Amino acid sequence: MGRIVGIDLGTTNSCIAVMEGGEVIVIPNAEGGRTTPSVVAFGKNGERIVGQVAKRQAITNPERTVISIKRHMGTNYRVKIDDKEYTPQEISAMILQKLKQDAEAYLGEKIEKAVITVPAYFTDAQRQATKDAGRIAGLEVLRIINEPTAAALAYGLDKEGEQTILVYDLGGGTFDVSILEIGDGVFEVKATAGNNRLGGDDFDQRIIDWLVENFKKEHGIDLRNDKMAMQRLKEAAEKAKIELSGVLETQINLPFIAANQNGPLHIDVTLTRAKFNELTADLVEATMGPTRQALADAGLKPEDIDKILLVGGSTRIPAVQEAIRKFFNKEPHKGINPDECVAIGAAIQAAVLAGEVKDVVLLDVTPLSLGIETLGGVFTKLIERNTTIPTSKSQIFTTAADNQTSVEIHVLQGERPMAADNVSLGRFTLTGIPPAPRGVPQIEVRFDIDVNGIVHVSAKDLGTGREQSITITNTSNLSEAEIKRMVEEAERYAEEDRKRKEEVETRNQADSLIYQAEKTLKDFKDKANPDLVARVEKAIAELREAMNSKDVQLMRAKMEELTKPLYELTSSIYQQSANQNQTQTGTNTQGNVYDADYKVNDDK
């Protein structure tokens, strides 16, 4: 089995890690960073830019830059660039492809298998969409694991004794809280809760809204209509939020943000930590609801928690830490890196699957209840939330009308009593039921949830033995043919990226060779053979012309044609120089002879 990597595919940043010689290492990207911004941009010529470079150009290219795509996973959302629409899976695949390529360059080998993390509260549709993104990027996703569980693995792998830990995971776009019991290599999730629409982006948005409203009051201009201005505000808000974790106030300075008849307008305001806390107080409180829910589901009180792990960059916000400190009456544990621990945990799970790490058992749970719609639009649960996975459960149902020959099984996920208020995972129909009075046929509905948290459902008529099943695989609205097309497209773009990189590198080499040749001519033209000088000048001109094309082979051929006469030219110059030196010093046939004065000391 080849190397299996662990990937934290985040809303704001992503991270990749691998087990190397018994230790997990976080793999730096091509730019040298340990995390990669989850940003994808499209250049004017259609080229794809991912990561730090994409984030840097976002201000000047906001309409062709995609951020926080994870928030749309498992939905019908589409990103339109030029005349082409992209699914969240395709955009996520571009981020995964960047991580994969950088890891391959770092490790010097192909990466084909991965463990990818998702928020614990991700639905089946969102989990399946994440698997699809992995496939499009050319990765076999061996396991999907929950982010808080991965963080617990990173924390607890080398810990002895039993502990009850709570993982508070506030990322860029999602919030999860999980309670685990760990000890003797067993990591058992007792309860999980969360909110898939709450994260650091929402804290940024509060600052943006505050800036926009103040500017509108002062100047009567609504900056929301200016995409470039909004991108500048987003970057400034994120920067201010980060700075306020370390200082009590920060300056937000955005010159030339807009203009009116009197000239350019600027933003230059001071944001204090107290004001930021006021703007975001309800967001902090919103994280405490799921925290209380998880404790209640696990049958625990705050004092029963031994350690609180903070995961995700947003947990650096002082108000968040204070809320946790106040609720649990203890300091949260700060011994793990909140940006990297999820990828590290995924790499540990990858090493477990590869057989490199022994005696580790991971028992995760399903975050939401699963069931079907029954008579009257009621949601009937078959598997309760926080059930350990993998698991299976069956229940007998019957027909609602006389002589009913088919039943539609509507599969749902959620906690609300009515079917319409929950997430629909899919529908399928069991046909061929013999006509009978209502209540007579017996239909067994069976749910199976695999280790990835992905659902398989079957319905069987116990009278005839007829069975129909569905694996909830197309909840992300991608057919197998679409996924295959996207995989091929991603491979084609990877090849185009490779060619583009090769072209740039060859162009740089050619440019360097021309510089070297021209410098040599400038320094030694008077001393050189005129024929050689003419050949070098001709070769330089031809190489310059070749550089105007995108033909790598032509550039290389012309570089070769320049290298030969340039080598002859420099060799002849060195030979001339050597001959001159020899003439000046003369030729000595008796080896090295030295003239020396000497003095005889007479001790007599």
Curated annotation (Swiss-Prot):
Biased composition (Low complexity): 579-592
SUPFAM superfamilies attached to this UniProt entry: Actin-like ATPase domain (SSF53067), Heat shock protein 70kD (HSP70), C-terminal subdomain (SSF100934), Heat shock protein 70kD (HSP70), peptide-binding domain (SSF100920)
Modified residues (Phosphothreonine): 174
Record region (Disordered): 578-604
InterPro entries, sorted: ATPase_NBD, Chaperone_DnaK, Heat_shock_70_CS, HSP70_C_sf, HSP70_peptide-bd_sf, Hsp_70_fam
PROSITE patterns: HSP70_1, HSP70_2, HSP70_3
Domain of life: Bacteria
Single annotated GO MF: ATP binding
Keywords for the protein's UniProt record, in alphabetical order: ATP-binding, Chaperone, Nucleotide-binding, Phosphoprotein, Stress response
Expression triggers: By stress conditions e.g. heat shock.
Family: Belongs to the heat shock protein 70 family.
Function (record text): Acts as a chaperone.
HAMAP family in alphabetical order: DnaK (MF_00332)
Name this protein carries in UniProt: Chaperone protein DnaK
Primary gene name: dnaK
